[in-house]
Amino acid sequence: MSNPDCLSKAISLVKTAIDNDNAEQYPDAYKYYQSALDYFMMALKYEKNEKSKEIIRSKVIEYLDRAEKLKVYLQEKNNQISSKSRVSNGNVEGSNSPTANEALDSDAKKLRSALTSAILVEKPNVRWDDIAGLENAKEALKETVLLPIKLPQLFSHGRKPWSGILLYGPPGTGKSYLAKAVATEAGSTFFSISSSDLVSKWMGESERLVRQLFEMAREQKPSIIFIDEIDSLCGSRSEGESESSRRIKTEFLVQMNGVGKDESGVLVLGATNIPWTLDSAIRRRFEKRIYIPLPNAHARARMFELNVGKIPSELTSQDFKELAKMTDGYSGSDISIVVRDAIMEPVRRIHTATHFKEVYDNKSNRTLVTPCSPGDPDAFESSWLEVNPEDIMEPKLTVRDFYSAVRKVKPTLNAGDIEKHTQFTKDFGAEG
């Protein structure tokens, strides 16, 4: 048998082994791992390319390790059966052997350890009131997350909360921010997952990670699994996609079905900027699909106000409304960038000032200095380097600072981007 034939046979056998392993058909899995390893060793013997040899060696080590664990497990299981038989005959013998599941438990512990970092221990401290607009989305999440925990008696006799919610919309509209609010308000175990947490270079490990994730969520319910950029894990099927990608998708489908069968307690919360690329079967598992649109004028005004926060400013509510009118088509992220640029203007005024004047600060009850025009009657010539830093009073933000920032910062989305989301909402979604 030629080297390419040996390698293809080895890959075919190891895929069968992994399928049996995932299905917990351990005797068959062990047998196929052994056969696959024989063919891998033959391929290694005839392979001339050093790089290819190294790849094959790493695979041999991985599958050999798994086969050894299965061997220990199967031997211990046989010992337990024999032990039970001896007990039934009145001959009890002590044993120092590990428990039957110890070999497999060590593998599960390793996977769980990799997922532990995804559990949010410290809450993000984002409240519903910190999010401007998106009232429909907030109400849907409260209905799904908070009410079943606070009023469990209402969710019986066929009344069940949603087990899958998809948040979709253009980038920067607040999908991840909503998830942070859920994590803060829910008081549930919160798993924050990205593709890097679940994708492994080792064959078969990615789907085992997915399975362990859902098992951990069920054990620690009420729990929420938040998957950001879920399209990177569960995109539409195509001829060109990898076997690994197909396996991850299949495992997600199986586990999300399992969530539904396992009654309430586990919510899968997905977020994506490109919902039309999701696999249709995955899309169906998200029973509630909520569009997170660009903010309206009222929400934009509130965003300006929230982003300015406690920074000293002269802006009025009317100024915030005026800025909202000027930023039609801006996302929440765009507005955040506008504010970040605007609040640097007082710093720039200090940095470029050639004249300062003395002012009395009521808060500290002392005289400070602040930048001013050279024509100011109280002005004295100086740069910020010649002034005691502790004596400089920060100039207040003005609406002109924001006008300047809006001119510099352009929206990141165009009409074509919005149209795609609008069409998807007509076909599959609901307004947020």
Swiss-Prot record:
Reaction(s) this enzyme catalyzes, per UniProt: ATP + H2O = ADP + phosphate + H(+)
Record's bilayer topology term: Peripheral membrane protein
Name this protein carries in UniProt: Suppressor protein of bem1/bed5 double mutants
Domain MIT: from-to ranges: 3-80
Record bears the keyword Transport: yes
Species in which this protein is naturally found: Schizosaccharomyces pombe (strain 972 / ATCC 24843) (Fission yeast)
Keywords from the UniProt entry: ATP-binding, Endosome, Hydrolase, Membrane, Nucleotide-binding, Protein transport, Transport
Compositional bias of kind Polar residues: 83-100
Keyword Membrane: yes
Phenotype when the gene is knocked out: Slow growth rates of spores and severe nuclear envelope (NE) morphology defects. Asymmetric and even failed karyokinesis. Overgrowth of nuclear membranes, so-called karmellae, in cells with daughter spindle pole bodies (SPBs) that often fail to separate normally or display extensive delays in separation. Large fenestrations through both the inner and outer nuclear membranes and abnormal nuclear integrity, i.e. leaking nuclei. Extensive whorls of disorganized tubulo-vesicular membranes that are topologically continuous with the adjacent karmellae.
Highest taxon above the source species: Eukaryota
EC number: 3.6.4.6
Positions of the UniProt region annotated as Disordered: 83-103
Pfam families named in the record: AAA, AAA_lid_3, MIT, Vps4_C
InterPro entries to which the protein is assigned, alphabetical: AAA+_ATPase, AAA_lid_3, ATPase_AAA_core, ATPase_AAA_CS, MIT_dom, MIT_dom_sf, MT-severing_AAA_ATPase, P-loop_NTPase
Similarity comment: family membership: Belongs to the AAA ATPase family.
Functional summary from the UniProt entry: Involved in the transport of biosynthetic membrane proteins from the prevacuolar/endosomal compartment to the vacuole. Involved in multivesicular body (MVB) protein sorting. Catalyzes the ATP-dependent dissociation of class E VPS proteins from endosomal membranes, such as the disassembly of the ESCRT-III complex. Plays a role in regulating nuclear envelope (NE) morphology and nuclear integrity, particularly during spindle pole body (SPB) extrusion or insertion through the NE, and perhaps during karyokinesis.
Predominant cellular place of this UniProt entry's protein: membrane
Biological processes per GO annotation: endosomal transport; late endosome to vacuole transport; mitotic nuclear membrane reassembly; protein transport to vacuole involved in ubiquitin-dependent protein catabolic process via the multivesicular body sorting pathway; vacuole organization
Intracellular or extracellular location(s): Endosome membrane
Residues where ATP binds: G169, P170, P171, G172, T173, G174, K175, S176
Single GO cellular component term: nucleus
UniProt GO molecular function: ATP binding; ATP hydrolysis activity
